[in-house]
Amino acid sequence: LSAEARARTVAYLPQSRQTEWQLPARTLVMLGRFPHRQMFKAPSAACEAAVDRALSAVNATEFSKRSVTTLSQGESARVFLARALAVEAPFLLVDEPTADMDPYHQIHVMEILKNVAKSGVGVLVVLHDLTLAARFMDKLLLMKQGQIVDSGTPKEILTAGNLEHVYRIS
């Protein structure tokens, strides 16, 4: 696949979500539409609608005109998630989506990701919070030092033996 085709196929939310750009949150989310836009042209109505849907999905519409440099870490994380959602790709890769969030927003983000998956998007989440993984994930892939230890449902994976082996907790 070409880089452009990959960009339309897989959306990515990195764990590191800092920016020094002093631009409105909505503009940052619009960057997610880059693979769908024509160079040097104004965003289409479809792009604007995709950005609206993404901002609404993460409850970020109210601060979408603020500079991303003025947002709290939790607000910023939601805006970056909106950027990934705005791609409207068939696959979404997400690295630690709930980092720096209070419990309410952690649950809200996980519900968003669950709904995205229910809509038919393939969602792969890297997550170290076992409680959130057990509550929201249908399937888990348990890894230790880059190697797959086990895979299956949360009930199958989150066993005392696996937790002892991978996390040294009992």
Where is each model-derived feature located?
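Conserved ABC ATPase "signature" region
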Residues: 30, 45-63, 88
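Catalytic Walker B motif of ABC-type/P-loop ATPase nucleotide-binding domains
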Residues: 92-96
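ABC ATPase "signature
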Residues: 151-152
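Conserved ABC ATPase signature
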Residues: 42, 67-71, 75
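A short, surface-exposed alpha-helical micro-motif characterized by mixed small hydrophobic
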Residues: 133-135
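H-loop/switch region of ABC-family ATPase nucleotide-binding domains
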Residues: 127-128
